[in-house]
Amino acid sequence: MQTTDLGNKESGKIWHRKPNPSTNEGIIVNIVHVDASHPSKSARFLHAGFDSAGDSFIAGDHLGNVYLFNLNRNRFDLVQKTMQACTAIAFNLHRRTEFLVALADNSVKCFDTGAKELVSWMRGHESAVTSISVHPSGRYAVTTSSDTAQLWDLDTFQRKRKLNVRQSVGIQKVFFLPLSNTILSCFKDDSIFAWESDTLACKYQLPIPEDGTKLRYKAFAITRDGRMLAAGGKSNNLHLWCLDSKQLFRIIQMPTKVRSVQQLEFLPENFDGGSSQILGVLSQDGIMRFINIQTCKLVFDIGSHDNGIVTSSVSPNGRYITSVMENGSLNIYSVQALSKELNKPPPPLVKMVDLSKDKDSTGNKSGVSGASQEKVRVSSGRTCRPWKSKDQIVRTKYLRPEDTTTSEDKENTLPAGLSKQRLQALLKGFGEYPAKYRMFIWRSLLQLPENHAAFSSLLDKGTHTQYKLLHQEYPIKSRKLLRVLQRTLSALAHWSAIFGETKYLPLLAFPFVKLFQNNQLICFEVVATVITNWCQHWFEYFPNPPINILGMVENLLAHHDKELLQHFINYGVTSQVYAWPLLETLFSEVLTREEWLRLFDNVFSNHPSFLLMAVVSYIISSRSPLLHCNQKDDFEYFFHHRNNLDIGNMIREAYHLMDTSPAEIHPRRLLSDFEPLTRGQYPIFNKYPKFIVDYQGQERERIRQEEIEYLRERQLTHKVEAEAVKRRLEDEAWYQQQELLKGAEEQRRKLLMDEEQKLLHQRQRLATVKRELRLKELQLLDAARRRFLRYQQDQRKMELRRLDDELERKMSLRERETATIAKDVEIRQMELEAQRRFFEQQLAKEQEAVTQEVKGEMDANRRRADLEEQMFWRLMETEEDLKDKKLLEESLAKAERLCVETDWKIQTLQKQKCDDQERGKRYVEVSKMTDDVREKERELCDVLKAMETRKWAEVSEKMTQLETEELASSALRAKRNQFLQERLRQEAEPVNISEDGNEYFERLRDLSRNSTQNDFSSSAERHVAENVCLNDVSASDSSTHFSLDRGRGELENRERALISEVRELRQKLATQARRKYPQLHFSETNWT
């Protein structure tokens, strides 16, 4: 069993090697969908549906992906992503590329597989759609949910009608009946109604069984002819309804292990006329059992208890079954492989038949009137082949009525349950079988075994050598028909060697091939059956026509129409002219299609001798035109072309000949009765002169070898002849080429001389042109040089003008500034003069006021002046020392900061330079010597570590030096403060302290923070109060006082804050450097 993973592919092959499904499982391929990104998660398929042809189907998973699988082309394609899980799918619309999908949001969408686009979106359901049924024409669809069913027009995608029911009842399923305009609705109370799809008028209602056989219907299936309905539910019983009589005609009981039916599907078969006999029953255990509803035999089953089936879909052609498994995968089964064992003659299966025919009482109770119900029990054991878990073999047991059957009835009973006598009576009454059931009747009459395995083995042998060039002898327009004819003839030739030598076999088989071109197995078996029964003794005189058979025809014609036979003899027309063309073509040349089908309805329904009677009947029915023929070509033309003939009269004449011909000349005496082909393997066909066929085969092989040798010699001769002709042509071409070369050489010499003369003239003209160009170039260069000099001169003039303008502007600006300053100076002088005059006035007033006190205060003023001068100069010296020290400290701090920054920059540059140099070296060394890389790296690391140690040592020294300088600065500052305090204390001792003075030394008191300084300032104030300065105008509180402090304390605070900021800035720079270049060493680097 092959397994295909779709993965994330949007298209690809379904299987990668030729499928070889086993007869035990029948699985062609198992399809899974695993997400490549999440291998543990896989998409689960939910539903699948085939198209109307049965060779393609679509399947949707729970992620909303819809795939198209083409089994003929072995290809799958992702056609749509709906992003929602699907609840139902339909793919049999009238537009082959469109499909319907019901989604989890209660909507139904129509998509196109070719364009991969949304065609329409249909809404209207309030609950999930459980099924979609499409009309046989593909133009209407019925969607069913639990509460409503809606009819849609697929041309306009508009809703036409809507079926509503009571919530207590509920809808189970609504679907179209095939081959009709009837809609069947099934409800949860087991009631079934039929509606006319055009008018939606109720046509009929199936009666509800009331004898305790309620099944609570859940699953339904309808045959292709729409005449039989199968229903099942929560029981192991199946109800089969005949929709023509509206009666329940059979109840099938499944094995006890089947407790409920989940799904029912009829399996279509070829030439069953739509009345399928195989019903697939999916039960609750996940196994789908296919049973024959007529014989109640278990045909085959699919699925297992380990991995059961959720839902299945059967292709309309009956070749494939697609099943969605419990694990979310998709299995594709081959019906041919599953039913291959059925072609072998198996032992009988267990069948328990219980016929209860209570026409009156049962019919009145159950509402099924005038019909008999047959209850059949299906056994679970089988003996034809081992099936999975079925290990019990139950012996066959038949329960039949006690009435006996005669041998005649046994002969007239066909395998499909048809009566040959009734068919013959029908044929005599109507003259032909119904066209609808003709293939099914022929298949039953011929009792075809359908040996799939044997036929496949014949096809596997390929095209027979005799029929490889069939298209040349029979140019058929239809390539398909030609291919089927070629395969059928090749299979016949592989079956028996005589058919490879029979020239008229294509003519004999062609009408059957054209009739059964869609089923090659049936075509082959029909032709083989015709050959083995209706072509008896044809090949005994091979390769001559069957003289014995033609003799029978001639004897019959002599008995029934001697005049016509004498006419043939008079003109030399033998039976090979008037009988053999009809037999070798089986009347296909002289009859139309309808006439031929009517004829063979009678041929297949009678003894093989009827075909010879039909030949004689055709000749006798055409005696009038034949008696008027007097040339042999006319006779040959007559029996190879269509003629005006009443086929009904001909067939009646054939029956008359069958009844009135004497026994001694009747073909029945020499021809055997009908014998069908054997099942399993085809019978041996050796009724021909084998030595002639072998001799012809040998002769043909010899002729073929001679033809091959002749062709080889002819090819060799042609090759030698072609070589000689080629050499002769080459010699002639060489001589012609030599002559042409001589003429061309002379012509080229003349042309060369002419060209040389032209070249000389051109060179002279070129030299002249060059001289002219050179002169022009010199003139242009001179003009350009002059133009450039002028340009430079202009530029310089412009620059000079610009400089002159700038000078003038600056001069005018300077003059304006000078005038402004002069005006400002004059105004300032005026202000100073005014202030001086104001002060002089003030001084004059004050001097006049204090003139009387000048003498008394001169001494005090002198002493106070000396004291102030002494203190002022002392304080001035101290402040200058402080300023010098402050400048020194600021300079030192700035120098240290610059030193650190410079060292850091130098180190960074050195590191970068070293890194660049070492990196360049490494690149060179890596390209040259790979083995020395690691050693160089270690050396480099050592060097870097040494540099790191050295640098960090320098940093430590710098930091130590900085701390030393800070300590020295702090010591100097403390020493300076102490010196000032001592000096102030020494100066404050001889001064008398007075508490009544003014606040002359208020700033000096702020500097002195201890008690000594307070005493000193108080004594100074008292002393000043006693000795009033001459310039002091007023001693009141509002007068202005002169301070000698000049903000020394504030300067000290600024100094400390500045040093602190410098320290913090240095720390920040160091931190940033460490972050940018951590630890100032490099780790070992791996070069690649």
UniProtKB/Swiss-Prot annotation:
Molecular adapter which is involved in cilium biogenesis. Part of a functional complex including OFD1 a centriolar protein involved in cilium assembly. Could regulate the cAMP-dependent phosphorylation of OFD1, and its subsequent ubiquitination by PJA2 which ultimately leads to its proteasomal degradation. Pfam families: RabGAP-TBC (PF00566), WD40 (PF00400). It comes from Xenopus tropicalis (Western clawed frog). WD repeats lie at residues 33-74, 75-116, 117-157, 158-200, 201-248, 249-296, 297-334. It is found in: Cytoplasm, Cytoskeleton, Microtubule organizing center, Centrosome; Cytoplasm, Cytoskeleton, Microtubule organizing center, Centrosome, Centriolar satellite; Cytoplasm, Cytoskeleton, Cilium basal body. PROSITE patterns: TBC_RABGAP, WD_REPEATS_1, WD_REPEATS_2, WD_REPEATS_REGION. One of its GO terms (molecular function) is molecular adaptor activity. InterPro entries: Rab-GAP-TBC_dom, Rab-GAP_TBC_sf, TBC1_cilium_biogenesis, WD40/YVTN_repeat-like_dom_sf, WD40_repeat_dom_sf, WD40_rpt. It comes from the Eukaryota. GO terms for biological process: cilium assembly. GO terms for cellular component: centriolar satellite; centrosome; ciliary basal body; cytoplasm. Transmembrane segments: none annotated. Residues 363-372 have a biased composition (Polar residues). This is TBC1 domain family member 31. Keywords: Cell projection, Cilium biogenesis/degradation, Coiled coil, Cytoplasm, Cytoskeleton, Repeat, WD repeat. Residues 432-607 form the Rab-GAP TBC domain. Residues 1-20, 356-381 are annotated as: Disordered. The keyword Cytoplasm applies. Residues 736-903, 1048-1076 form a coiled coil.
